[in-house]
A protein has these predicted regions:
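Hydrophobic alpha/beta core scaffold segments
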Residues: 563-567
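Active-site glycine- and acidic-residue-rich loops that bind
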Residues: 548
């Protein structure tokens, strides 16, 4: 347990002991995800889904964050993180914690989920555990579907060690020629386009188990000495030069290079022969500390196949978001522009219907002959999104249509490039983003002629224009036609699409120029008033709290006695509850059915609350290296809605975790005799009651 000395006011607020390492904090977030796979109150297939999410999260963590730490260590660059933990210690801490977590994941699978699935009629079994009838069925599928696509690749004279694609599942083998007594290494890639599990009646057999049982078929006349299942993770991070004059070309080049990034992790079965593992690590250039022995099966992302099974009895009850009363009239969609003219509107997804609000906003703009122009940002979207076809129709109708497609959105670059080309071919004015800055702001603007004037309608969100994630991420959106906010948003669009310095903004806070300064100013304002006897309170909900300047401002506010409550889903880089520094700070995390993605920044002084929502998290990358926007929410009724969201999550005793000053987390429990309060269930209940 870490204890923190009481630093002197202000001068000691940069003491590394007050901060928690980013990478190690993220691993604790993923531990909270894994905990959901153990929760007996969660339906069985949803628990399998959380196993897959945990593994998918971990893959991306290695591809981006671990790769970055390894690169920084190799370059010898001095560490600039607030915690000042040496990179060697960070990597060692990652290795130990990851090994612990993946072993726990394997135990959850073997001891809990696999037996429960069998009880529910979904039996998972290795090939050698099948009945004769089941073996025959799998043999037939192997010959018909699997064997034709397998390609054994041996290593020897004229046969170099094969390229191993990132995140692919493989079998490594040593094969001996009984006549020549020559031993060679060979590799078989488990085909990624085939189902991870093959069905034989009511039993599912892992594909790698089927292939491993049939390796003799691929090496006739040879003796297979040893086999090992293995998987590699490659560096997928990249940076685009600020000087690049062809952003699209630079991104496409980096996507091609990503396939050949250096190996940052080698996973092998925990019973893998040591000499075979050594041969693999030497051939791949992997250090021993980057080799992870893990329980089978490797790669639990394959459980997405199970999680999608049509078993309603083993899944969450479906949630069909009701339509807010202002969204319908006698069951029919209303004129959304007329509704916005009556006053600002706030939507909270998935509790409020994304289709009936955000999609309706764009669709109505396309169909409305009075609309002159539509402008929108697009960071991530889905293949079935109706928004892209709507923008294309708008351009084809002659409306001025502008779409900023962020081609640097990590792991969505290729998808976004395809959307960009489709939009551009249809006459949409497409902007790629800014070199050196990712445009992460979530904005849509509709310019409409009304009589002898032109009015601008704006949607400002915390989440992507993506109907798929809108069903599983919690996000907020503000609709407004306030002239001051609309003018700010128009100026930001012009800054991004044109050639100008970033302007000053009247209402919104925009990164990378003004956002940090604005939020720190609000924190300091509340703190100073509190010192002078005007009671204050700060409430923040975000995905990550890591920025040193913001954290130090919160420490100063805590030293002034301001109660500070934070709901941080993922990375929390500060220690709350430290005497003399952060003792009035309470930091929680909500992890549940929906991924908490909304950002709220609320500052109360003397009973008056000022609040903002928007796209930014409190990280250096968001505040210095992205175009972000947060907007004030001024309407008293909407402010009440925002604070109600915060209050119900602060009262959560079912999904909430709380951070101690020593950096450990504990589950928040209900008081004796009280029923647990699940904030996500409560928000669904409230949404249904409003409809």
């Amino acid at each position: 347990m870490t204890t923190v000395e009481h630093p002197s006011p202000r001068s000691g607020l940069s003491d590394p002991e007050l901060y928690i390492n980013r990478e190690l904090s993220w691993l604790e977030f993923n531990q909270r995800v894994l905990h959901l796979a153990q929760d007996p109150d969660i339906p069985l297939l949803e628990r399998c889904k959380f196993m897959a999410i945990f593994s998918s999260n971990l893959d991306e963590f290695f591809m981006v964050r671990v790769a970055a730490v390894q690169d920084a260590q190799a370059s010898g660059r001095p560490s600039s993180t607030p915690d000042a933990l040496p990179r060697e210690d960070v990597l060692q801490g990652i290795g130990l914690r990851v090994q612990e977590l993946v072993r726990r994941q394997g135990a959850i699978w073997r001891r809990e989920l696999q037996p429960l699935l069998a009880d529910a009629g979904i039996r998972i079994a290795a090939f050698d555990r099948l009945s004769e009838h089941e073996r025959v069925a799998i043999e037939e599928r192997f010959e018909r579907e699997v064997y034709p696509v397998l390609t054994p690749l041996a290593v020897g004279p004229g046969l170099p060690f094969p390229y191993i694609s990132g995140l692919s599942l493989n079998l490594g083998l040593t094969v001996r020629d009984p006549i020549e007594n020559e031993v060679r290494f060979a590799r078989i890639k488990v085909p990624p386009r085939l189902p991870r599990f093959l069905a034989a009646g009511d039993v599912l057999v892992p594909l790698e188990s089927v292939i491993e049982h049939h390796v003799d078929r691929l090496f006739p006349g040879m003796e297979v000495v040893d086999t090992v299942q293995f998987r590699v993770t490659r560096d997928a991070d990249y940076a685009i030069s600020d000087e690049s004059d062809d952003l699209l070309g630079a991104v496409e080049a980096q996507i091609r290079r990503r396939r050949f990034g250096h190996v940052v992790r080698l996973e092998v079965a925990d019973d893998a022969p040591a000499d075979l593992v050594r041969q693999l690590s030497d051939s791949l250039g992997v250090r021993q500390q980057d080799v992870y022995r893990v329980p089978l099966p490797l790669d639990f992302t394959g459980l997405w196949q199970l999680a999608s099974k049509d078993r309603p009895d083993l899944r969450d009850e479906p949630w069909d978001a009701p339509r807010e009363p202002w969204l319908t009239s006698d069951g029919d969609p209303i004129d959304i522009f007329a509704a916005i003219r009556r006053g600002d509107l706030l939507v909270h997804h998935p509790y409020d219907d994304f289709e009936a609000s955000v999609e309706r906003f764009v669709e109505q703009a396309v169909a409305d002959p009075s609309v002159l122009a539509i402008k929108q940002t697009m960071y991530r979207t889905s293949g079935d999104s109706p928004i892209v076809p709507a923008l294309i129709r708008a351009a084809e109708q002659g409306k001025q249509t502008v779409c900023l497609v962020e081609v640097q959105a990590r792991f969505d670059e290729q998808n976004n490039i395809q959307w960009e080309r489709k939009l551009e071919r249809s006459g949409v004015h497409v902007v790629y983003g800014l070199a050196g800055l990712k445009t992460h702001a979530k904005l849509a603007m509709v310019i409409r002629r009304e009589g002898d004037r032109v009015r601008r309608y704006v949607h400002i969100g915390t989440g992507n224009y993506n109907p798929t994630t809108a069903r599983i991420y919690t996000d907020l959106g503000l609709f407004t036609c306030r002239e001051d906010v609309a003018e700010d948003v128009a100026n930001l669009f012009n800054y991004i699409t044109g050639f100008a310095r970033q302007p000053a903004y009247e209402q919104v806070l925009v990164a990378p120029t003004y956002l940090r300064e604005g939020l720190v100013g609000e924190i300091d304002r509340v703190a100073e008033a509190h010192r002078q006897g005007t009671p204050g309170r700060i409430a923040i909900k975000c995905n990550a709290m890591l920025d040193g300047e913001v954290i130090r401002a919160l420490f100063r506010a805590s030293q002034a006695g301001v109660p500070i409550q934070m709901i941080v889903r993922s990375i929390a880089g500060l220690r709350p509850g430290v005497p003399g520094v952060s003792e009035t700070i309470e930091l929680r995390s909500i992890v549940g059915r929906y991924l908490e993605h909304a950002r709220i920044f609320a500052f109360t002084s003397g009973g008056e609350t000022r609040a903002w929502i928007g796209s930014a998290d409190m990280m250096v990358r968001n505040l210095d290296k992205r175009v972000e926007l947060v907007t004030p929410v001024d309407d008293p009724a909407l402010l009440d809605e925002l604070m109600a969201i915060i209050e119900v999550q602060l009262a959560d005793t079912a999904l909430a975790w709380q951070l101690r000053s020593d950096g450990t987390w504990f589950r928040v429990q209900p008081r004796s005799g009280e029923r647990p309060l699940n904030s996500q269930d409560e928000l669904m209940r409230r949404a249904a009651a409003r409809a």
